[in-house]
Swiss-Prot record:
The keyword Cytoplasm does not apply. This is LexA repressor. It comes from Geotalea uraniireducens (strain Rf4) (Geobacter uraniireducens). Keywords: Autocatalytic cleavage, DNA damage, DNA repair, DNA replication, DNA-binding, Hydrolase, Repressor, SOS response, Transcription, Transcription regulation. Homodimer. It comes from the Bacteria. PANTHER family: LEXA REPRESSOR (PTHR33516), LEXA REPRESSOR-RELATED (PTHR33516:SF2).
Length: 201
């Protein structure tokens, strides 16, 4: 089989998760609504690609006519709120929904999504509105992109530990880093960002 693009993997994972939880495949509108695709034409293009590459077949004339070819292991990951890629903002931890992804893309247990707001990580390819897949962990290596909490406020930045301070570095040349000295406050690492998911249509 041909290799899938990340977007095609997301469509296939949602179909698999919907089949597992409901017992029948989703409609075009349900796929579009889940992935943020306006209209059915964009969804049909993804399904055409999946069928051409041998991952699905479709029964003509049926709104739920998608049939998986082989097994796809999908899992639904909770979206637990918004994290600002910019200035600090209060952490939001109420589950707002779920997003289905290929289980092979999930590295670790208890992973969750945070929706990115702001453009301080734009030069790392992380845009406002993206879903950041976060693996919970309390430590980070220099250069990791993390979700960090400072005094109950959360931010998404690149992490650096330097002598007596921690630097949370934006990936936007127009913005300054957040510097926290050891005696000025505590930085808690919520988790490491292991993937970014985006609606392309």
């Amino acid at each position: 089989m041909e290799k899938l693009t990340p977007r095609q993997q997301m469509v296939l994972a949602f179909i698999s998760a919907h089949l597992e939880s409901h017992g029948y495949p989703p409609t075009l509108r349900e796929i579009g609504g889940h992935l943020g695709i306006n209209g059915t034409l964009g969804v049909m293009k993804h399904l055409d690609a999946l069928e051409r590459k041998g991952f699905i077949t479709r029964n003509a004339g049926s709104s739920r006519g998608i049939v998986l070819v082989g097994a796809v292991a999908a899992t639904s990951i909770p979206i637990v709120g918004v994290v600002r890629a910019g200035a600090l903002q209060p952490a939001i931890e109420d589950i707002e929904g779920y997003f289905a992804v290929d289980r092979a893309l999930v590295k670790g247990a208890d992973c969750f999504f945070l929706r990115v707001k702001g453009d301080s990580m734009i030069e790392a390819g992380i845009r406002s509105g993206d879903l950041a897949l976060v693996r919970p962990q309390a430590t980070a290596d220099n250069g990791d992109i993390v979700v960090a909490r400072i005094n109950d406020e959360a931010t998404l930045k690149r992490f650096f530990r330097e002598k007596d301070r921690i630097r949370l570095q934006p990936e936007n040349s127009a913005m300054e880093p957040i510097i926290v000295k050891a005696k000025a406050g505590e930085v808690n690492i919520i988790g490491k960002v292991t993937g970014i998911f985006r609606s392309l249509e």
